Amino acid sequence: MGKVVGIDLGTTNSVVAVMEGGKPVVIANAEGMRTTPSVVGFSKDGERVVGQMARRQTVLNPQNTFFAVKRYIGRRYNELSPESKRVPYTIRKDEVGNIKVACPRLNKEFSAEEISAMVLKKLADDASAYLGSAVTGAVITVPAYFNDSQRQATRDAGRIAGLEVLRILNEPTAASLAYGLDRGDTETILVFDLGGGTFDVSILEVGDGVFEVKATSGDTQLGGNDFDKKIVDWLAEQFLETEGVDLRRDRQALQRLMEAAEKAKIELSAVSITDINLPFITATEDGPKHLETRLTRSQFEGLCVDLLGRVRNPVKRALKDAGLRPDDIEEVVLVGGSTRMPMVKQLVRDLIGIEPSENVNPDEVVAMGAAIQAGILAGEFKDVLLLDVTPLSLGLEAIGGVMKKLIPRNTTIPVRRSDIFSTSENNQNSVEIHVVQGEREMAGDNKSLGRFKLYGIPPAPRGIPQIQVAFDIDANGILQVTALDRTTGREQSITIQGASTLSESEVNRMIQEAQKYADVDRERKERVEKRTRSEALILQGERQLREVALEFGMQFARNRRQRIDNISRELKESLKENDDRGIDQAYADLQDALYELNREVRQYYAEDEDDDLFATIKDIFVGDKDKERDLPRDSYRERDAYNNRDYGRDYGRDYGRDSRPSYDNSRPPRKSPRPSYQDNWDDDDDWL
């Protein structure tokens, strides 16, 4: 069985962690970073890039670079606000009302699940490289306030990425696992999770291995990106007033504004004033235009007053649902990078009355909690009990369009609830079950999760047939609905997949496409690595030829050196023509030729050492009357090594050797110290 990891699939950044030695460990990605930007892009040649590489191309390639797609996962196009649609890439509605992002580079449209799957695949591959074995399973976290469609969509993203999703875990609950795993005393904590695109607040009782969620609340459309957009609008309005140009209408300028806004937001968490300079942001008939301004922390906080109000309400609602007062909260755990903003920390102090805990890394704690949950499922932890809740009420549409609630919000899961319903008309032979989720009294004002019909009801007056409808929520928070005609025993059930999620056939198609992409990516990576190895070998060969020529002269191993030079030219030509077979053949030939040259050099030195040994024996028994050995070596180097070699040694004397190989009928002098010509393709110099 493959490895199982915990993944925090974030709006802005994602993190992967694994259990090692009973402790959660965050895994660095291939670029060496502990967080991976949740960004997917397609370069000018159609190559897919994920993470930091994709983020680097956002300004130059905004239409083919996709970020913050977590805000669209599991949602319908008509549910989006105008603010949510204001991104540099194109968002469209498909034939059933789902959200698609357009990729002009490939002339193709992707669902949010597919883009998220590419991020998950990147995280899983990096984790596999770290662990040394394939990652096949994952615990993936979602905002606590995600509805059923969004949870299903996240699970589908994991399947498309080739992962077995063992559990969908709420982010605040995951954070509480990482925070309270080793704590013995029971305490009431509030997890305040403000990420890049979502906001959650959960109240839990933690202690002695029990993690019980008392209440949860939040806003899936509120996060750090909204704070960034306040700065974007402020900058754009200033520029519009002074230059008469709305930068938000230019995709590239909008992307630069968004990056500058995020940078300014981060800086204002540490300083009270920041400079924003964007040269050549646009051009008019008068020439290029630059954006230069200053933003103070107080100005920024003034821009975000309404957002702070949206943060305040879920906290109050969670306290009310849990039946607690602020004084009952013993610890506040901050999760998400946006909680670093001073105004957010101050808001928490004002609401709860205590200083937030600084004991956890807000960027990594959720992934670490997911890894702990993976360890629980694998049996690594025996005495841990996790009791989560459903964030929103679940019910169905009854007569008159009202919502009949079967499972109220903040009900501990897993849970099963049922109720008896009947027909609204005489001789009605079928009933439609319309499942909704939300807190409004009318079904039409809530989120529609799906519809299905129960057929074959015997004719009877209205109100006589008895239809039992049961709601089952599993530990992942995913709903299954069953309708049973108690008269006939006929049953119909459905795992809710609302119109905003993918059908099974679509998921299977995307899995196949993801595998095709994986194969293409692997082949492209192999070609790049092959080219890099070949270029390094060519440079190694050229360097070695120069050193051999300088050390032994131009006549030493002349034929071998000429062959190496010819093969190097062949390899360069194959690289230029992208001839894979030619590259493979020339690479192997060049390796063999360099090996033979190295062998000849080593053989020469071995024989020269024999000469030194016999000369020493001669000196011991005969003496060195001519003092020729006292001559400086520099005098030898000034001579032509291949004409009348006289090195102060009697080469006519037999020292017991039967034969000596000839190297082009000449023997160059040996230099000291002896250089090493062992093949070492990992030397840093090989890559210069």
Curated annotation (Swiss-Prot):
CDD domains given in the database record: ASKHA_NBD_HSP70_DnaK-like
Residue segments, region Disordered: 630-688
This protein's UniProt keywords: ATP-binding, Chaperone, Nucleotide-binding, Phosphoprotein, Stress response
InterPro entries documented for this protein: ATPase_NBD, Chaperone_DnaK, Heat_shock_70_CS, HSP70_peptide-bd_sf, Hsp_70_fam
Induction / repression: By stress conditions e.g. heat shock.
Highest taxon, organism lineage: Bacteria
Regions of compositional bias (Basic and acidic residues) in chain numbering: 630-661
Chain positions with Phosphothreonine modification: 198
One Pfam family of this chain: HSP70
Keyword Chaperone: yes
GO MF annotations in UniProt: ATP binding; ATP-dependent protein folding chaperone; unfolded protein binding
Family annotation (PROSITE patterns): HSP70_1, HSP70_2, HSP70_3
Database matches in PANTHER family: HEAT SHOCK PROTEIN 70KDA
Function recorded in the entry: Acts as a chaperone.
Entry's family note: Belongs to the heat shock protein 70 family.
Name by which UniProt lists this protein: Chaperone protein dnaK1
Source species: Nostoc sp. (strain PCC 7120 / SAG 25.82 / UTEX 2576)
